[in-house]
Structure formats: C-alpha cells, structure tokens
C-alpha cells in the first residue's frame, strides 16, 4: 500500500507542519485508495471528492501561511452514516431514510471540522446500527479487509475497514453495544467507546440511552487526539455529567505515562461465554505485557458480569424496545423495506411488556452499581473484545448479531472501553478490551497506549483483495 495512506493523523499533521507532506497530496492519495479498494470491501456509501479536494487546498494554504485552524487541519476523516455531516445525506443504511443533504453537522462533527478535519465520505452501517455485522438492504454487505469472505463486524464496519485499509486515518463512529469496538477488533485497528455523554451526540443518539460517539483510528494516540477535539468545548450541560476533571482533559496529555502501579484485573475467559482458545491466549499475553510494565495484574472472575453473561436479556430487551419505538413511527409501507433482522428485532420489542422492560432497567442499575464497587478495587479491567474470530455474515447466529455479551455491558453501565489489536486467532486479528471506571477515559487510553507500545507495530491487511461472488450486494 501507498506509505502516505497508512500514516496516522498525528504523523500527517507533523508532516504538514514540517512541509514534507501536503494536505492536497494526502487527500488525493486517500481518495485514490478508495477508488482502488472500495469496490471490493464496500466501506463507503458516499464520497464527495470535489468538496474534499477543495477543503484540502484551503488547508494547504493555511499551513503555507503558518496558520493552521486546529490540530487536525487537513486530516481526512470518514464518518459513519448515522452521524449528520453538512453536505451529505444521513441514510442510516435504510431505504426508509431521506436522501436530502444535511444542512449542518452533528455537534461532535462540527468540532472536528473546526479543528480542520476534512469529512470526505460516509461509511456503511447496518440499518440504524441495529446489529454487530455491517450489512443492510440499502448498501449491501461490508467485507473484512483481512478476508473478504468474512464480516468486519458492526455496526461501524465501514469505518473500521476504511481505517484499516488506508482510506483515511480517522473515522467518527457510534457504539450502542459494541459497534465501535467489535469492528475495530475484527479489522485490526483501535476503537474507543467513551464514557456515556462525554461526546455530544446530537441526533445520532436521540432515540437510545445506550449509544455514544467515538473514534476509530490506527493507533491510540490518534484516537486520543480525536477524542480531545470532540470534547474540547466541554460537554453540553443537559447531556453530560459534571464534577470530574477527566471530562475536560487533553487526552493526549500523560498518554505515555505508563501503567506502573496501576491495579489491573483481567478476565480472559469470562464465565458463561465460550472464548476461542487463541483469543484467550492473546488476552492473557496482553495482561502479562502490562504486568511487565509495572502494573499490579490479577486474574478476576468479575462476579457481577457472571450473572449478566448468564442472563443476557438486559441488553436485548432494551435494544428491541428502542427499535420497536423507531419502527412504530414509520409508515406501513416503509416497514416493508426494513432489513429482516431489524424487523424481527422491532417485532420482538413490541412483545415486551412494561414489567419486563422495568426489570431490564432495574438490572441495568444494579449492574452499574456493582461495577462501581468493582472499580473501587481495580483501576482497569481487561477482557476479550469478542469471543470468536471474524465470521461469514450468514454464519453469525441471529442472537449474537444484536446482543454481544462482552461489549454491551459497557454501554449498560456507561463505562469507557477501548479495543486494541492484541494478536491473531486463525490468521485473523483479535483485540483486547480495556475498560475503566466512569469518567476514567484518560486512564483507559493511557493503558491502551502502554500496551500498544509494548506490543510493537501491528501489521496492516494485505494489499490484494478479491470480492467473492456470494450475493451479498445491496437489495433494490
């Protein structure tokens, strides 16, 4: 692959500053990469080359004058198609959506744009982000960059694939149950789900109390830089939680301070979840790496999560009710256009009675309280990000598509969590999930960076991709 397209955002900015790279040169290389590869992997549902090149020219002039508009000036950015970007439609992966272009950015996108990031394309998603694979009737299936017969996970699969293949160093995505972390794990990149409400969501999370916006990047430093930009004006008072200085932090500050003295628990094989042996081994190796860096590392069974893994209904009940609510407001003709998986999810939500939903909410509060106690004993927790290697879309059981046990509990509790590549299982990438207490985003990123540094450079997917003829295209 072209070396330029595999540079991280921080490296690009350093090159712009030193005049060894030009925003126009970089954007042109990224767009050429999209042209070369996206017909195979289907990571993008919209690209605006003309606006992107015009914005890159503007950024280049600012760098020549020595007046960059912000810390991401000239950096290409892709955005998941659940997030509003001015000049692009927000289709949500759905035939039921409007093709009309947005007049303004979502709040987090507006902050990234003011910092100089250039949104050049929208990435694919499952319909309304309903499942952890990325396929929908509108855009078809997105393919794993390591093996195009397989899924990259979801619902932010387009974002993860784009970053993995050099189609932009950063992507803005959403996570309602693992939708950032799972595709990051299966694509071999870094994904970070911030503390709930840390990043202003706007309309992207107006209908669910589980989802948050976050970065997908090729390295932890870039994820921290992107998070710093998205939170640099503080959180909106109506949607945020005051009282923690961590909410106002520069997430790049102290990123290289290491993990010496931290209390880190790990659970490589959670009770109630069958983990592939190679994935379990990778997580244990990650724990040993942090121990070698001076952390106090212990194996833990995480008792509160044993009940959650064994039950599994808490997330699926809430998730189905949220989608039932969305479908209820659609015209009858639009409901017939929905992805069958989404329709089945909404139909299941219609069958949930008030008592069952109340029980799910009470269980959520109980788990949140239990994990608050747990994180009084430990600073961080390590688990696998996902229990198995990437699967063919038809091969992933329907239940797992919407209720990922290892990641969804972080959405239930609002805790920050990162997925960092930690090795390979069967020749395919896997990830370790690093979880912190509420508001402890900086510490999660610091540990992720420490592990990343100890691990060394993670390889990129091969440059040769072939699209199999398996009928996983968009449905008219």
Show the residue positions of the predicted features:
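N-terminal, positively charged, Ser/Thr/Ala/Gly-biased leader segments
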Residues: 20-28, 34-97
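Short glycine/serine-rich loop/turn segments
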Residues: 72-213, 267-269, 383-398
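Serine-dependent amide/ester hydrolase catalytic core
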Residues: 11-17, 57, 326-412, 459-475
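An N-terminal boundary/leader segment
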Residues: 1-53, 292-294, 350-351, 460-476
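Short helix-loop capping/hinge segments that flank enzyme active sites or metal/cofactor-binding pockets
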Residues: 72-92, 256-268, 317-372, 419-429
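Structural helix-boundary/capping segments
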Residues: 36, 114, 164-270, 284-293, ...
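Acyltransferase
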Residues: 23-28, 57, 250, 277-302, ...
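Conserved hydrophobic/aromatic pocket- or pore-lining residues that grip, position, or stack substrates
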Residues: 30, 52, 74, 80, ...
